[in-house]
Amino acid sequence: RQIMSEADCLYNEAQIEAAIDKVAYAINAELSERNPVVFCVMNGGLIFTGKLLPKLNFPLELSYLHATRYRNETSGGDLFWKAKPEISFIDRDVLIIDDILDEGHTLGAIIDFCRHAGASNVYTAVLIDKDHQRKARPDLQADFIGLPCVDRFIFGYGMDYKGYWRNAPGIFAVKGL
């Protein structure tokens, strides 16, 4: 509780919902005729995916995958696959939905996995794009971005602090991080 009471609110729920509407509009314009397979990146992408899907007005197949570098810590390690996709996406367009593009190691590995497994095109949607110069690859950027964010440790709307506060109704920055 102390983490939340001392945190700075960067985006409130209304701002986040407006950003999700903006992302949905862009995805509808780009993918409505492409019959995509949509992958929710667990656990962080769960809330964003759940809020976004009802706003997508076209048929799609939904599945999930779980790859992480954090394992409830505040800094990342090696990529660990907890669950690889179980649905076929060979010769299909894929949309990967995740909570945040930070350095991009996890998202980059998921993109590579989908491309090597036969996806026609791979698109990415993130709720948050963290603003810094430490991206894993210079060309790595999300196709659909909800909100930019300062380079601080954040939580809420799916993002956690040591496994907690994914349920926070906004995006908050940890004091001192």
Protein language model features and the residues they cover:
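PRPP-associated nucleotide enzymes
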Residues: 1-177
